[in-house]
Amino acid sequence: MATAASNPYLPGNSLLAAGSIVHSDAAGAGGGGGGGGGGGGGGAGGGGGGMQPGSAAVTSGAYRGDPSSVKMVQSDFMQGAMAASNGGHMLSHAHQWVTALPHAAAAAAAAAAAAVEASSPWSGSAVGMAGSPQQPPQPPPPPPQGPDVKGGAGRDDLHAGTALHHRGPPHLGPPPPPPHQGHPGGWGAAAAAAAAAAAAAAAAHLPSMAGGQQPPPQSLLYSQPGGFTVNGMLSAPPGPGGGGGGAGGGAQSLVHPGLVRGDTPELAEHHHHHHHHAHPHPPHPHHAQGPPHHGGGGGGAGPGLNSHDPHSDEDTPTSDDLEQFAKQFKQRRIKLGFTQADVGLALGTLYGNVFSQTTICRFEALQLSFKNMCKLKPLLNKWLEEADSSTGSPTSIDKIAAQGRKRKKRTSIEVSVKGALESHFLKCPKPSAQEITNLADSLQLEKEVVRVWFCNRRQKEKRMTPPGIQQQTPDDVYSQVGTVSADTPPPHHGLQTSVQ
């Protein structure tokens, strides 16, 4: 079996030296771990001999006098049982799921763990059961040269189980193959019992999580040094405000709301409460693919996730508001005596946004898009306020409106002058520039007025003439009389129609 020294995630056997997974037994008694469980609970003391004072035991001496110590030892069995059903991956050591179990669920977990111990040939160590069945058993190698490794076979299994707890990559494929030939029937019973224990643990834990119960008391919480996450992967200690940075991968990591533990019970309570709201779904049965995520840096789920967006849609008007404003704006504009072009010009001069008369017209008719209506409404509202405040006194709006109204006065031509222009048009519909100048001087009109009158007269003639008939002048009619051929109709018919 693999040892902690061969694990790539634990260089220099620093994890075992940190003492985060196992707890030191100050008494140093050989059967101390087994006596606290009651009913085959002492896993690390299976070697038979007494452990050294520096060796590690699964259960800590601080829990022996406490009635909850039975649950702690049962949680050790649950750890091995759930690890066997999870393909060799241990979830955590005495995590809050098992410590928060009711006594009935804990008793069921102990019974299932006892069945696992009786049926499994590797029942010498509760932690050793976490070994993957995919690897055949090997003779225990010599103990590593660490300062705290002094045990025998039980210690080797303990190191092996701890090392397998940190190994990677995870098993995401089909279920593990049948057990080794040397151990017939051992892992089949273990898997069945582990499945029952896992179901009991989940059934007991999920209602308590959904009910929003208080986190377990301080005596049921393990104090864990900084730098370790729930998965057992190494990570940077969470900084101030880092909160859950060890999860790293978010939903891709096997971090359940009830599994996160911090340095103090207050921090653990914070994680328990916050992750319950941030990730209400049950944990995924597999680890995430890829290397372990190193936390540190930003907290996985900060309080900003549940905070409400301060930006609201209160400032955005509704369609009814826009319709009501457009109606009022049109009434006020007409009452003040401004045209739509005046408003567009005033907006461009006052606020820097030039709008045409067409845009103002479409706004009043509610023919603009909702987005453009919302953009134009505050500008028109400001213009209305400015116009209302300046009523009765000439202000900049009146000056701008006066500039917008600048257009040439319509020219009125007398009847006698119009008759002279008509007679000249019948003679020559397209006078030259010199003829226009002479005619303007004789009629005492501007040259531009005469030119525009002839242009308008030609357009009027085109509208009055059907499109299929070519307009003919009297000169053209008389010129066609001398060129009549034998197969053409008599010219007097065309002449009579032209004259009439």
UniProtKB/Swiss-Prot annotation:
**Do you know which PROSITE patterns this protein is assigned to?**
HOMEOBOX_1, HOMEOBOX_2, POU_1, POU_2, POU_3
Expression by tissue: Brain.
- Per UniProt, the ranges with Basic residues bias are 270-287
Q: Which spans does this entry mark as compositional bias, Polar residues?
A: 468-486
Key word Metal-binding present in the record?
A: no
Stretch list, region Disordered: 32-63, 122-190, 231-319, 461-500
SUPFAM superfamilies from the UniProt entry:
Homeodomain-like, lambda repressor-like DNA-binding domains
Q: Where in the cell is it found?
A: Nucleus
What organism is this sequence from? Homo sapiens (Human)
Key words of the record: Developmental protein, Disease variant, DNA-binding, Homeobox, Intellectual disability, Neurogenesis, Nucleus, Transcription, Transcription regulation
- Family the UniProt entry places it in: Belongs to the POU transcription factor family. Class-3 subfamily.
Where does the record place Gly residues bias?
A: 32-52, 241-251, 293-303
Gene from which this protein is expressed:
POU3F3
Question: Might you report a single GO cellular component term?
Answer: nucleoplasm
Q: What is this protein called?
A: POU domain, class 3, transcription factor 3
Give GO terms: molecular function aspect only: DNA-binding transcription factor activity; DNA-binding transcription factor activity, RNA polymerase II-specific; HMG box domain binding; protein homodimerization activity; RNA polymerase II cis-regulatory region sequence-specific DNA binding; sequence-specific DNA binding
